């Protein structure tokens, strides 16, 4: 398997002239994996952690498989965490997962495990159901709405960029990760407070 990867990365000639060990030492993205071992978590062993907005419009419960397997919240390989985050989310009937938001750097993928509802995206609201796979690239606002009669459960896979700025178009708020600081932006002169 390693030889196949090396051939894809460097071509057959590069593999014949250079040892596998020296190639591994020269390529930092491969070195990150070197010396690590498999991490494991079982979803059914994890408690559901509830997250509700003060007035109850937004509500979900989550199981963080990545955190249970040794990952760090919003921290990728650049900070000693995992390269992606994996969670299971469950939205009760009549609730919404999060305020509509768009990431500047992070990709998110959702796989609907059970239930039905709507995704609110660039085309407005569209019906979703078990078996649907949704991919949200950076810059695309999205949210899930459970307008069904049972829980809407889905798998979330997200990469872990070193920094991500999240915009909430309905309220004009911003959030910066990994610091998780939320703010409203006010226009200011570039040199204000600098001299």
Where are these regions (language model features)?
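Ligand-binding loop in jelly-roll beta-barrel domains
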Residues: 118, 138-164
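Polybasic, lysine-rich low-complexity intrinsically disordered segments
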Residues: 7, 21-22, 27
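Conserved short histidine dyad/triad with adjacent acidic residue
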Residues: 69-73, 87-103
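A short, N-terminal "cap"/entry segment at the start of jelly-roll beta-barrel domains
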Residues: 26-83, 169-195
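Short acidic-glycine-tyrosine-enriched beta hairpin
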Residues: 123-138
């Amino acid at each position: 398997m390693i030889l196949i990867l090396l051939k894809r990365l460097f071509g057959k000639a590069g593999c014949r002239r250079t040892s596998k060990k020296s190639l591994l030492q020269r390529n930092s993205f491969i070195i990150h994996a070197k010396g690590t071992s498999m991490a494991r978590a079982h979803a059914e062993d994890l408690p559901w952690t509830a997250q509700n907005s003060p007035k109850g419009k937004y509500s979900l419960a989550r199981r963080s498989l990545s955190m249970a397997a040794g990952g760090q919240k919003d921290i990728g390989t650049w900070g000693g965490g995992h390269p992606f985050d994996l969670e299971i989310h469950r939205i009760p009937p009549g609730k919404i997962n999060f305020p509509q938001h768009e990431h500047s750097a992070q990709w998110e993928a959702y796989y609907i495990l059970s239930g039905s509802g709507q995704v609110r995206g660039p085309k407005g609201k569209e019906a979703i159901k078990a078996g649907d796979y949704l991919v949200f690239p950076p810059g695309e606002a999205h949210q899930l709405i459970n307008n069904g009669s049972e829980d809407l459960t889905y798998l979330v896979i997200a990469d872990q960029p070193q920094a991500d700025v999240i915009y909430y178009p309905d309220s004009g708020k911003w959030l910066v990760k990994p610091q998780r600081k939320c703010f409203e932006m006010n226009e200011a002169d570039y040199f204000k407070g600098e001299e």
